[in-house]
Regions:
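Boundary detector for helix-to-coil junctions that initiate low-complexity/charged tails
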Residues: 1-14
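Secretory-pathway glycan-assembly enzymes, especially type II membrane glycosyltransferases
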Residues: 17-209, 213, 218-219, 223, ...
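Short, flexible/disordered intra-domain loops and linkers
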Residues: 51-52, 188-203, 255-277
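A donor-sugar binding/catalytic signature common to diverse glycosyltransferases
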Residues: 63, 280-322
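Short glycine-/acidic-enriched loop or helix-start segments at secondary-structure transitions
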Residues: 88, 235-237, 304-306
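Catalytic donor nucleotide-activated moiety binding site of glycosyltransferases and closely related
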Residues: 180-187, 216-271
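A short, acidic, amphipathic alpha-helical segment used as a generic capping/interface helix at domain edges
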Residues: 210-212, 276-282
Length: 323
């Protein structure tokens, strides 16, 4: 119990939250890439060593790294070219961060000048948390939401696509309950995969359905958006809620065929990787636009929470980590 209290206590103040991030980032290391004779700009290349992660795992890992770089007086440049994300491995010559996001300060890898830019590289760790879901201090939550809106911006083309998707899917004036389900995590846990170690346990589909029935009425919502990975979950929610159930139309697996672990790496190489991640981004963005939100803890839920302007009602199932 004392350990739990200590865990929650660290989120009470923005300053203590930031100090923890700084300590973790310091351990990640930083090394010099270019030292010009006459420096005009200080550039920090932000890199991740983790490769088997989704776009929103990058989002919540790079967010504190961007803030840390800016406070050091550096111009942050997110680099997903030097170490690629497996889920976008078909694009070896591209900085895949820029498929979906603008650079924080509008400076990219192609803009660097060896004659005048001092360049250092730092490595963002998966263990650096921006866990606003755990935060009980509203000022801290608003600080990071505003920071994220300023420095992690979707590209103009993607912003337009997301706005169109919202208009097409959400009826005007609808009060929407967002429900985030990640069946793949639970399949990993059942497989006892080493990849699942350190990941948060997820509420089952049945538990989320039960909660959604209760919260839809209790929180006065007239529509429900379900984001998920399997065909069975979509069918279950549509049978239960009928026309009130909304979802992004995208390719999904059956639960039995759902590839996880090593099979996921192989499967993703055969897909339209950019479209796969784009569909995921649409889902998480729409969750951020919901009236209320019901989820388990994962990087997509964290990102939706950060991108949102706040929810009338919010419930996250925190079931601990797989050790």
């Amino acid at each position: 119990m004392n350990r739990q209290l200590k865990t929650f206590a660290k989120y009470i103040l923005k300053s203590s939250f930031r100090r923890q991030i700084e300590d973790l980032l310091d351990r990640c290391g930083e090394h010099s890439v270019n030292v010009p004779a006459h420096r005009e700009r200080s550039i920090e290349l932000l890199t991740r060593q983790e490769t088997d992660v989704g776009v929103f795992s990058d989002y919540i890992a790079f967010l504190p790294a961007i803030e840390c770089a800016i406070r050091k007086g550096h111009i942050p440049v997110v680099d997903r070219k030097t170490i690629h994300n497996t889920f976008l491995s078909n694009y070896a010559d591209a900085n895949t961060w820029e498929f979906y996001f603008e650079q924080p300060c509008s400076v990219g890898l192609d803009d660097l000048n060896n004659d005048s830019d001092e360049v250092v590289r730092s490595y963002s760790s998966a263990n650096v948390p921006v866990s606003l879901i755990d935060c009980r201090d509203e000022a801290t939550v608003q600080y990071w939401r505003q920071f994220a809106r300023r420095y992690i911006r979707f590209t103009p083309e993607l912003r337009q696509q997301l706005a169109e998707t919202e208009r097409e899917l959400f009826p005007a004036g609808a009060r929407v309950l967002g429900v985030s389900i990640r069946e793949g995590y639970n399949k990993l846990f059942q497989m006892n995969s080493k990849i699942a170690v350190g990941h948060p346990f997820q509420a089952s589909t049945e538990e989320m359905l039960s909660q959604a029935k209760q919260r839809l009425e209790e929180w006065n919502c007239d529509r429900l958006l379900v984001t998920c990975q399997t065909e069975e979950t979509v069918e279950l929610f549509r049978r239960t809620f009928g026309e009130r159930c909304l979802c992004v139309e995208r390719p999904r697996y059956t639960y039995e065929a759902l590839p996880e672990g090593e099979r996921a790496r192989e499967a993703v190489r055969k897909t339209d990787q950019r479209q796969h991640e784009l569909d995921y981004i649409k889902e998480i963005y729409l969750l951020s636009r919901c009236t209320s939100f019901l989820c388990s803890k994962n990087s997509g839920s964290e990102a939706a929470f950060i991108m949102s302007e706040g929810y009338e009602h919010f419930q996250c199932f925190e079931l601990g980590l797989n050790r």
